[in-house]
Amino acid sequence: MTLPRHRFVSAKTPFFTAITQSSMFYLRLLSQFIRNALIREMMFPANFLIQVVTRLFWFAARVALFRLIYSEVQQIREWSRDEYFTFMATGMLINSIVEAFFMPNCAAFCEQIRTGRLDFALTRPVDAQFLVSLQRLNPAMFTQVLLAAALLIMSLSEINRPISPYAVILYLFYLGVAVTFFYSLMIATACTSIWFGRNQGLYDFWFYITIFAQYPRSIYDGTDAGRFESGEALQFAFSWVLPILLVVTIPAQTILSTAGHPAFALAMLASTTACFVLSRMVFNWSLGHYRGASS
């Protein structure tokens, strides 16, 4: 693959000019990755079609399941049917973006180490983590992005509640925070391939993590105020230790104008920032222990 030409900036280049030039270079590089991914998929249209049909079936089955559940009850833990579908669409948007851009690359990280292709990435005039994280994409997941967006719009229209432009901007920001959080977890986990050689548990890790994020935080509330229940233990762990519940619940509550305590949003932002910085440190530290294809 030929990389776009990168105009290297000198020490005398103004700061904002340097940032702009670097950003434009990486945007061009990302657009080339997307174009290459589409070309690869069109070489095997049957495989692409099967993936799309599978996503459509999974989406339809999940929506039908919760329509059936909500036909028997009006609310589940203060979430009405359309409010829950808004939450579901938010979770799908986050998952589909992560799986489209980052999952194929993180899953292939150990293969790059085994075959020596990681050496190639490290010798390119590009940030190694950017190249390792985004060089292969899964275009079939873009179908799920569209489905999730359609479900979100339909659910919000059914609720018929006014949404301010500020809420939309904040919602999109929180989506970006959530994607960053899950990416940070994923790339840090993938880095273990440098020591283990193979890391086949990445898909299992992602599957179990996203199971907990499929339901709003309030679902894990206890039923007995007099004792600390197992659901509340999970709620605490996945809210304050590893905020998996917050990164999906808070964006949904924001667009629904039912946001909870500001401490939840602060915890999500702080945890995501810490996770991203830590994942960057783990990646660079792992590369320091990488000995090349011959090892």
Language model segments and positions:
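N-terminal amphipathic/basic-hydrophobic helices that include classical n-h-c signal peptides
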Residues: 1-22
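Hydrophobic transmembrane alpha-helices and immediately adjacent juxtamembrane helices
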Residues: 19-295
